[in-house]
Amino acid sequence: MLYILDMGNVIIDIDFKRVLAVWSNLSGTPLATLTKSFSMGEMFEKHERGQITDLEFADTLCQEMSISLSFEQFTAGWHAIFIDIRPEVIQIMEKLREAGHRVVVLSNTNRLHQDYWPHNYPEIAASADYLYLSQDLAMRKPEPDIFKYVLEKEGFSPDQAVFFDDVLENVEAASALGIKGIHVVDRQTVPDYFKEVGFSE
């Protein structure tokens, strides 16, 4: 079987409010103001596809939020999204590979984050057979082509794949292609799934 796992809030806990809190502190802008003005719009998606530079992304977001931050300050906030690894999921990934299954990560991410998490959380790459990252592929979830690409590269049919993601839209997109989609709603979703199918951790 091919097991495809999203990264944020599946393998590692993330919280975007932490990003805005850092930017609020550094810019002197109230958190409530930033929360209202920030949106994951077109530039956000372009950044995840690797279609714009980190500097262009930072400048655009700062303009949209009407805040003045240096690139270093922007980056400090951007990296604050990460909380910690979910060790129970890392353990499952390792056990799946030991049992002969293929385990890959499929994440909507960006160059700024990729400059950070691989060094701070090396167990993610160490526990996966391959990392499929949106900015390397010029595609992002929930676009069907990104799922088709992973299946083709891995040599599995949709009915041989299980996909875990915390965003329902992504799960539905994978399911529409015939992949078994699991919506991760909390830390227990992944361990509970494998208990239900009889896979021992």
Model feature map: region roles:
Residues 8, 13, 104-108, 165:
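Short beta-strand segments
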Residues 34, 43-47, 93:
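Generic hydrophobic alpha-helical segments
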Residues 72-104, 144:
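Short, acidic loop-to-helix structural element flanking the phosphoryl-transfer center
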Residues 19-23, 58-61, 78, 113-117:
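Hydrophobic alpha-helical core bundles mediating ligand binding, dimerization, or RNAP-core interactions
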Residues 18, 22, 42, 56, ...:
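Alpha-helical elements of Rossmann-like donor-binding domains used by nucleotide-donor carbohydrate transfer enzymes
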Residues 45-75:
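A metal-dependent, Asp-based hydrolase signature
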Residues 1-39, 67, 176-177, 192:
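Active-site neighborhood of HAD-like aspartate-dependent phosphohydrolases
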Residues 1, 5, 110-111, 115-201:
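Asp-based, Mg2+/Mn2+-dependent phosphohydrolase catalytic module
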